[in-house]
Amino acid sequence: LNEENTVEPEERDASTPSPVLIVPGHLFFVDRINLPQALESSEIDDFAELSLENLAPFPVEQLYWGYLYSKSAGSILLYASYKERIKAQGYQHIETYLWVLPDFATLFGAAFSDATTLQLEGDESFSRITFAAEDSLPQQIISSPEVQKLEGEHAPLRLKLESTEVN
């Protein structure tokens, strides 16, 4: 990669990790997984990791991954990306971050009274996100580096991501 394609965090004391690195959503695999009814809240972390181990072609240690959970949804939204894929995009000093998240995770907790489809536009990614009425976990997320791949039906709500520093 040349220097023009390199994304670097602001200079900071290496002993103080930055909390969050937000990267384009299209770099992540996403799956909504129903939770077994008998599953206790304390078991969700283990369930998510086991689910990921069954789905991912790479060991969990080689992934940036996480999940979104809403108690009322009865499911989790599992997301993962191969660490080398993120590094290949030019992100440097990733180890200084506590979390590496897809841009669509910034909408966690959003809920709409009616079924809603929105388009989240970042600098390098476009995500079409579909919510069922009153559900804070998306039913579906389709992300792409090109907006043309997501066009078709009209997304009634468009949101533009702005770069921000999270401290």
Set out the residue ranges of the language-model regions.
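Hydrophobic/aromatic-enriched cytosolic interaction surfaces used to assemble or bind macromolecules
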Residues: 1-167
